[in-house]
Amino acid sequence: MSTSDKPETTLHRFLANPLAVVGAIILALIVLSSALASVLAGADPAFSAIRDAFLAPFSAGHPLGTDSAGRDIWARLLYGGQISLLGALLALVVAALIGIPAGLLAGYYGRWFDSVSVWMANLVQSMPGIVVLLAARAVLGPSIWISMLIFGVILSPGFYRVVRTAVINVRGELYVDAAKVSGLRDSAIIGRHILTVVRGPIIIQASLLLGIALAIQSGLEFLGVGDNSVPSWGNMLNEGFRSIYRAPITLLWPSLAIGLTCAALVIIGNGLRDALEERGSSSARRGRRKNVVTATAAMAALPAVDVDALDRDALDEAAPLTRPGVNTADETETIVTAPLADLEFVPEPAWSDSTPLETPEPDPSAVLSVRRLRVGYGSGPHDKTVVHNVSLDVHAGEVLGLVGESGSGKTQTAFAVLGLLPTGGRVTNGSVLFDGDELTTRSRASIRELRGTGIAYIPQEPMSNLDPSFKVGSQLSTPMMRRLGLDKRAARTRALELLDRVGIREPERTYDSYPHEISGGMAQRVLIAGAVSCRPRLLIADEPTTALDVTVQAEVLRLLRELQSEQEMAVILVTHNFGVVADICDRVAVMNKGTIVEQNDVESLFARPRHPYTQTLLGSTLEGGPSRIDLDRAEAEGAHR
Amino acid sequence: MSEQLLSVDKLGVDFTRRRTTFTALEEITFSIAEGETVGLVGESGSGKTTIGRSILGLVPPTRGTLTFRGEDITHASRTKRRELSRDMQVVFQDPYTSLNPSLTIEGILAEPLRAQGIDRREAGRRVKELLDRVRLPSDAAGRLPREFSGGQRQRVAIARALALRPRLIVCDEPVSALDLTTQQRVLDLFIEIQRDTGCAYLFVSHDLSVIRHVSHRVIVLNRGKIVESGGVEKVTSDPDDPYTQRLMMSAPLPDPGAQRERREELEKLRVDSERAA
């Protein structure tokens, strides 16, 4: 793996954002020139010469002119920057010192500290900041440092809330549990595992709070309740405002300084957020596997299909092929068992010589006839083919198993037939004939017409495929009203019949339940009921039992078998489980790295697997294999010999 | 009988949420001897994961006692737990979330070693040994978890569990997120490590065939209670308990003929149980 393939860092992504870079440069210039005020100013900011009052910019010795007291504006701007920025920084540091530890403790330990600190944060946030600062000034006198100290306390819930939420999110991660079991002290866990996660949000929050502190501080001074003995941007605003009719330009310089600084901080904050979130989203995508296809898509009968949601599921399947960074070194997996090594050389698709599918011509008697299907992602030099030359037929009343490991292209093939390939994916070659109709050249809209009545779909994750905000009943009956033209009452009756048919004991109750009120097995039955509700000719089931308990799986398979023979459906069952294949399939196509390596009827495939990959897969199933006692006995005999 | 490493006696765990109490485990009693694998099988909600987590100190037991090497660890303090981590480790189910995405493999593996006060150089040497042990290339040390496949990440998680040379490893569904061929290789690695190091496993899984492959003794759980326990041969091929029978018969066999027979037997069980009800 070359270093150029390495995922780019947050800094790289930040630097690639031109706006953020401009913001950073502006802020750096402002900070630097304030820091170097004694070198750059050329005049004493407090030196007053009444004779020189209100000199115009570019006067001799006064590049930005002078104010009402004849003081050099350029010098006051630079020295004022020191005071203003340091004041804002003081507020930020105080807010961070209070907010971050409190957030960490509340988020990590919870319990009473959490309740008390949330209550305190609410209290602080509900107090009007300006009023508190005015009161403090009245009691403690005008000092920018005291007011910024107090303002820091007022700002601290900003940090507290962000940190607490982030910590609560990572606290439940398995790697935090693993660290506990590894014997790490809480302080080490917080430092190593928790702070790394909350670091990003803290930095972003800091840039925003700094801007707020600067703005509030200037606002106070502009109102004249600040400490006017020191030069600061807010004091300069105040003075400029008082002489707005005589020399309006004196108001411009501090406004510019404050405005530019605040704008730069906001831009930097946004840039940081974008840079960090890009990283976050990619890892979240890998973490959250196999999810969300809405029920409407699942039942495939409503015209509106959440293709975006489908994307994630499908991309996951494609991930090992499409993302160079993810699947780097599978070679170490293959080192372990030598026989797998020769699988690197996958021959041309076996359908051309070893299957009943010799004919390259589409089979007119089949419900679905796929020929030389190729699916690719992207275009140009970076395009990736995830399905190569796939040909298969499914007849009415037949169940075809599409078997393979993750990344084999089985789900991609199914989605290509459904016309639901994720963004960036397309059929680059071949044909898909459904009842004699070519699907690859049809528009998405016209394929949509087919869903439900022509082709239906059962997803893997039943729970995430029902919309949590609608009752089960409406999710079942709406598609039937749209597709079959039933009225509300008829759709309800039919939905209840279907629920009864899929073995749900109290159809009425389930009909009126929300998805969270039913179990995973029930949800899958509901989705199956939805899929068969419009009597489709072809049913595509993508790992329909993988997320279910094994006893529930057996029942769902029984149901699928019954429905399939009742309705004479053609079924494509995508699975990785050879037991499921043996149980329900008539024919099997084995996929590896985007090609079908072997295709045969189910009896022959299990009795005489021809392709070495099929043999390896069948050899890896544990079901019906030796027990640990057998293994130990064999090992002992081996050692004895 | 060989020396008991861990004894679980009448363990019970309640979870309280919004003032309603839910009993996750009841009257769980079993023990694990040095060097053996005890398989814990059950479906979702059976409480199998909770048993592992309470042994590890991640879930406080409500009732009963846990004895590890003759010492009562039921309510061990955090300090005591840190000590115990030398002897008791874990491999979690999900290889995607059990490794901190922002640490390198070396950082992950050195963590338990450093926590026990082993110096940096020695830790580095041990990390190389561990990678070798789980058959990952030694240049893996400098890489991030996301650069590895699921099976490889699970090898990293196994290496982390082995780092402190524990006597007991709780394996919580460690192969259920893996592909078929990867799954078998990882299971064989578990067995090989056990033969070499003599550590004991509490192996938690929903899959009876996985349990059969790695366990010497098997415990079947249903709704927080033990329904059957015994030697692997007996429990996984000729179980007495009706639930275990159903569990076994529900798993389809990768052989169309044999599966047809199994399906018919399952159907018979189903009809019988419906008649009984």
Segments and roles (model prediction):
Chain B
Residues 1-250, 262-277:
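ABC transporter nucleotide-binding domains
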Residues 251-255:
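Conserved NTP-handling cores and scaffolds of large molecular machines
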